[in-house]
Amino acid sequence: MSKILIVNSVYYTEIANLLLEGATDKFKGNNIGYEIIKAPGTFEIPAAILFAVKGKNTNYDGYLALGCVIRGETDHYKYVCKGVIEGLNAIVMHHAIPLGMGIITADSKDKALIRADKNKKNVGGHAASTVLHMIDLHNKLK
């Protein structure tokens, strides 16, 4: 059985809960073990995953990043999005780990809620499917 580390940003609690529900439903349906840790914001997700990758007492088959960044009135949105995507990409490229990225970037909370809801866009569920696919691919190519 595969074991996944889910790093869930809790900055937008309602969205975080929806993302997590979509992801864990996918894992339960596939008999996948998982552990959940909370990051204070989406920007902190890459660091949390790197802590686990470099940790001596962790043994995960894959990683799932769940979070949301909503556009505001300043450039903060642009820099957070760029930092998160580049941070996750660097970890994947340097450590060759299976990762699913369920990071919602949206212009409004309403749009983010639609993307997070498992009965609508289900970003969390799709990201969970991605990490499972990447674990299979990783195992085939090792």
Curated annotation (Swiss-Prot):
Keywords: Riboflavin biosynthesis, Transferase. It holds the Pfam family DMRL_synthase. Pathway: Cofactor biosynthesis; riboflavin biosynthesis; riboflavin from 2-hydroxy-3-oxobutyl phosphate and 5-amino-6-(D-ribitylamino)uracil: step 1/2. (2S)-2-hydroxy-3-oxobutyl phosphate binds at E73, T74, R115. Transmembrane segments: none annotated. It catalyses: (2S)-2-hydroxy-3-oxobutyl phosphate + 5-amino-6-(D-ribitylamino)uracil = 6,7-dimethyl-8-(1-D-ribityl)lumazine + phosphate + 2 H2O + H(+). It is an enzyme of class 2 (transferase). One of its GO terms (cellular component) is riboflavin synthase complex. The active site is at H76. Its EC number is 2.5.1.78. One of its GO terms (biological process) is riboflavin biosynthetic process. GO terms for molecular function: 6,7-dimethyl-8-ribityllumazine synthase activity. 5-amino-6-(D-ribitylamino)uracil binds at Y11, T42, F43, E44, C68, V69, I70, M101. Catalyzes the formation of 6,7-dimethyl-8-ribityllumazine by condensation of 5-amino-6-(D-ribitylamino)uracil with 3,4-dihydroxy-2-butanone 4-phosphate. This is the penultimate step in the biosynthesis of riboflavin. Belongs to the DMRL synthase family. PANTHER family: 6,7-DIMETHYL-8-RIBITYLLUMAZINE SYNTHASE, 6,7-DIMETHYL-8-RIBITYLLUMAZINE SYNTHASE DMRL SYNTHASE LUMAZINE SYNTHASE. This is 6,7-dimethyl-8-ribityllumazine synthase. The lineage of its organism: Bacteria, Pseudomonadati, Pseudomonadota, Alphaproteobacteria, Rickettsiales.
